[in-house]
Regions:
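Alpha-helical membrane and juxtamembrane elements of multi-pass inner-membrane transport
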Residues: 12-15, 28, 76, 158
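A cross-family signal for key residues in well-ordered alpha-helices
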Residues: 24, 39, 48
Length: 171
């Protein structure tokens, strides 16, 4: 009987399989976490690019459509550029992020710079020379993040936030 036990403790067959069974859950967790982190950074980058494109689109609208302290005339189109990547959206268009379904997550605000400099000189020249106030548009998005683990019922409760500003030059 003693010989059988000693043989069992010194037998190395199957030890690699046992070690793999112990380490596999850790490796799978690390791989899933890496995928999740990559998806988070990708989605954050998509939101950053979207608000930047929305601010650029808004900056190219006419001065009349961007009243200081008011609401942009084409606010719906600006929000469409942010969420869909295009100003006019059809029924078959999909948002840049498949879970970005709420247009209220995008805000467009307009404020103005006073275009008065030192000794009567203007701060801004060119298209702004005759203007006393220069409109600046800010596009902000606050998107609730949907992680990969949401298919298992887990939700991290994270929000992707981005903001971009551009001075309106009314082309």
């Amino acid at each position: 009987m003693m010989g059988g036990r000693a043989r069992l403790w010194t037998d190395r067959r199957g030890s690699a399989a046992a070690e793999m069974a112990m380490v596999a859950p850790l490796l799978i967790g690390i791989m899933f976490g890496s995928l999740q982190m990559g998806k988070f950074f990708w989605d954050e980058h998509q939101v950053l690019k979207a608000v930047r494109d929305g601010a650029r689109y808004a900056a190219r609208q006419s001065f009349a459509s961007m009243p200081c302290g008011g609401t942009a005339t084409g606010e719906t189109q600006i929000k469409n550029v942010v969420r869909y990547g295009r100003a006019v959206v059809t029924g078959s268009d999909r948002p840049l992020l498949n879970y970005w379904t709420d247009p209220a997550t995008v805000t467009v605000t307009i404020d103005c710079y006073a275009n008065a400099g030192v000794d009567g000189a203007r701060i801004y020249d060119g298209v702004y020379t005759a203007r006393s106030n220069v409109p600046r548009v800010t596009v902000t998005a606050s998107v609730p993040y949907t992680p990969l683990a949401s298919i298992f019922g887990f939700n991290a409760g994270l929000t992707l936030n981005a903001s971009s500003q551009a001075t309106v030059f009314g082309l």
